[in-house]
């Protein structure tokens, strides 16, 4: 088919561009799902197939469907070379362990600002003064914004780890959480802090699936957010940035490059910038989009966007400004 002829060279190129431990996610409707799976088996190899994730794309499916009302899209996942890297899904609330240990030597440890989460119901935005409420002492005043300190800080207590060991753990992806005012800090090792993702990206309340696992939005959520950002309804059915962030968090490291062959409204770019702002990452994005003309009757054309590329470029500019503010 024309669709297969269009996809084949792009997927072939995508495989060649992936690093050895790279991953590809491909969003597809049910109509071409079978064909896409066969195509990817040929290009990436059946052994490198990971999963077909199901995503609830709409909460308002067409009411006039005669057989069924389709709510789902699918995301096909392959690795270039299947490996042992674990994917991070839902964060485990109970996956943390105490860093304090009675009887250990009292020592000072320096923590990076973006590696310690202060539970926001206990630590609202503002200044946390130097204090020793119990067994842990905060050496200096710090400012907390949205659950994170705005600068590195030092804690003093009977800690299990030395500074060198702490630094090694941080390099492996270990993070920390402080849940109460007594500052009893706990650590979350990267491999222990997450469930593996299920193949349902957004659970809905049905007899089969009755637990919502994450905060991934729908097309309607994405349209509302984009309309607010662009001050007009200029792009139909954009993907939610929460979907891209959820997938990226499976495996993407803070210095990785993310390529989108069909960038459309540049959701990938927006999601990557937002991720970087949240964890001080240095991820980069490459967006590829043909300059497909907008219809002269469309809101996009009336707003001055003559092709889809112009929409994406303006979204990147506006999203970048919003993320920095």
What are these regions (language model features)?
Residues 75, 79-82, 314-324:
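Phosphate/diphosphate-binding loops
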Residues 1-257, 279, 290-295:
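Class I S-adenosyl-L-methionine
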Residues 136, 185, 271-273, 325:
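Hydrophobic transmembrane signal anchors and adjacent membrane-proximal interface regions, especially
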